[in-house]
């Protein structure tokens, strides 16, 4: 009943509707502009051959749901709480790193923007600043799923949170490898976080979450197979920053292991693939991240996105049961 109550609250419904409408309006404006600026995606040659035909598809489309979410936030919440603003800073801050990465790829005309070292340094700097700023409001404790308890990280909180942000943002980035995949999964993740935020009394934070979910639903119209636009690192890092910060504010970073199970699986598949090849010279998967493995098995992009979304729904219910 609490879940239903949160979803029929007029403010929540309006936030979803407004962000959906704003993103739907921005899409047909921003996508042609990206075409005109020749902000086309460069495709990795070592990736699936079926993806080569996607070369030139506009990227940096994450600006659509970033702007839509920001506009909706300030329309619905004239004076957002500090917690909601911290989530917004994380959303925009990590998105800015992604924007720099995308811009360099476009300038270089190849799928190489910031080096992995440069990107990691920027992610750690932003996460360090945000965590230091946020912990004054949220403390240093985190909840343990299923155990109904907390653990206080004390002095380890800030360094642990910094690497947590780097991990989550990179995980969402890895998930953004198929048309509509990261978008579909993150709609579900942000909806879950919005419901929990509402039920815990964080109304401004809940509005941020559902505004992002509504904007992503609209973006999915342009990003689903065959994609008319890609979110780029601009979008994927922004999404990672948003879900990571909201979960941290709620003292539930560990819950992302459940609701973000696809992010976890995608990341583990890459780690296992690299480790196996270096240690044995053999690959576990036909290609990593794992969504490409299923492509190589003959699954369509639409089927993979559907199955991964269903898995996310199942694990969201498991996460509800753990609270």
Curated annotation (Swiss-Prot):
According to the UniProt record, what class of enzyme is this? transferase
**How does the protein associate with the membrane?**
Multi-pass membrane protein
Q: Where in the cell is it found?
A: Cell membrane
| Pathway info | Cell wall biogenesis; peptidoglycan biosynthesis
Tagged with keyword Zinc: no
What keywords are assigned to this protein? Cell cycle, Cell division, Cell membrane, Cell shape, Cell wall biogenesis/degradation, Magnesium, Membrane, Metal-binding, Peptidoglycan synthesis, Transferase, Transmembrane, Transmembrane helix
Q: What is its EC number?
A: 2.7.8.13
| CDD domains listed in its UniProt record | GT_MraY
Pfam families per the record? Glycos_transf_4
Q: Which residues cross the membrane?
A: 12-32, 58-78, 84-104, 120-140, 151-171, 177-197, 200-220, 229-250, 303-323
UniProt cross-references to PROSITE patterns, sorted A to Z:
MRAY_2
Co-factor(s): Mg(2+)
**One GO molecular function term?**
UDP-N-acetylmuramoyl-L-alanyl-D-glutamyl-meso-2,6-diaminopimelyl-D-alanyl-D-alanine:undecaprenyl-phosphate transferase activity
* InterPro entries in UniProt: Glycosyl_transferase_4, PNAcMuramoyl-5peptid_Trfase, PNAcMuramoyl-5peptid_Trfase_CS
Q: Which GO terms describe its cellular component?
A: plasma membrane
* UniProt-listed GO biological process terms: cell division; cell wall organization; peptidoglycan biosynthetic process; regulation of cell shape
Give me the reactions it catalyses.
UDP-N-acetyl-alpha-D-muramoyl-L-alanyl-gamma-D-glutamyl-meso-2,6-diaminopimeloyl-D-alanyl-D-alanine + di-trans,octa-cis-undecaprenyl phosphate = di-trans,octa-cis-undecaprenyl diphospho-N-acetyl-alpha-D-muramoyl-L-alanyl-D-glutamyl-meso-2,6-diaminopimeloyl-D-alanyl-D-alanine + UMP
**What function is annotated for this protein?**
Catalyzes the initial step of the lipid cycle reactions in the biosynthesis of the cell wall peptidoglycan: transfers peptidoglycan precursor phospho-MurNAc-pentapeptide from UDP-MurNAc-pentapeptide onto the lipid carrier undecaprenyl phosphate, yielding undecaprenyl-pyrophosphoryl-MurNAc-pentapeptide, known as lipid I.
Family to which this protein belongs = Belongs to the glycosyltransferase 4 family. MraY subfamily.
Protein name stated in the entry: Phospho-N-acetylmuramoyl-pentapeptide-transferase
Classification from the root reads: Bacteria, Bacillati, Bacillota, Clostridia, Eubacteriales
